């Protein structure tokens, strides 16, 4: 592993209804970046906020000599799509992603950059003393284990978005045009050298988590279907096992019928229906998984943009780019500073 020279660092932060957190976020992130020995930019992507987050970001970007770049999406597309929009607009040799809720400290940015300089393609983080509720922690642990086994990359906390990516990894992710994207897993599929560090995890001071139960369900299906075909293989194994059990159960019923006679066969009707419902339920689960894969294939084949950038505002106090969509080649979407 060789050292990686860094001249410019980009911080990409997706923002959705974070009006109360933004002043502190902007102050702390800029202060942390000033400890870097590199030029930097802070790209904040408003993901269709319903409060005045977009206006706050634009005001910050319009300051004289401001390090902030405001990327305004026309509506809400989700956290990972917003980060991809930020990737298209940033120009750093190393790109740091950070959530806007301040649960992960921006003060960790210099440490991640230092590790990236050592030659790591991806620097992940693990939340110590996690402050989320139990109903968020346990599903996260299960998902982390499942992802590790399906991808073969042993990283402990895929849910923590405070991460550093080398430019080549970012460009590789931008070249992937699928709509259902989970960035940490996608990045690790291209990375050769990865590492993890422990970071603090604070309680959310303002607002609630933007991941509703339905969004968590959608995220789970994205994780299952976007990076592996293992569930389809499991369906084949389960289907074969159910068919074998069905044959064995039918043989058992015939034997019991011969031993106990016709009256017993009549009494066993409800058992037969119970087994039938189990098999039918298994079939519907399999059909649902197949539907998820086919639905995502359909979305990718249509090749619609993953997001639509309404405008990009930089420190020149003018709108640099308007009406940019993600269907354009990533390199064509970049805007000169």
Curated annotation (Swiss-Prot):
Its UniProt pathway annotation is: Glycolipid biosynthesis; 4-amino-4-deoxy-alpha-L-arabinose undecaprenyl phosphate biosynthesis; 4-amino-4-deoxy-alpha-L-arabinose undecaprenyl phosphate from UDP-4-deoxy-4-formamido-beta-L-arabinose and undecaprenyl phosphate: step 1/2; Bacterial outer membrane biogenesis; lipopolysaccharide biosynthesis
| EC top class, as a word | transferase
**Topology within the bilayer:** Multi-pass membrane protein
Pfam families in the record: Glycos_transf_2
Enzyme Commission number: 2.4.2.53
Per the record, its GO cellular-component terms are: plasma membrane
Protein name, per record:
Undecaprenyl-phosphate 4-deoxy-4-formamido-L-arabinose transferase
Q: What is the species of this protein?
A: Pseudomonas savastanoi pv. phaseolicola (strain 1448A / Race 6)
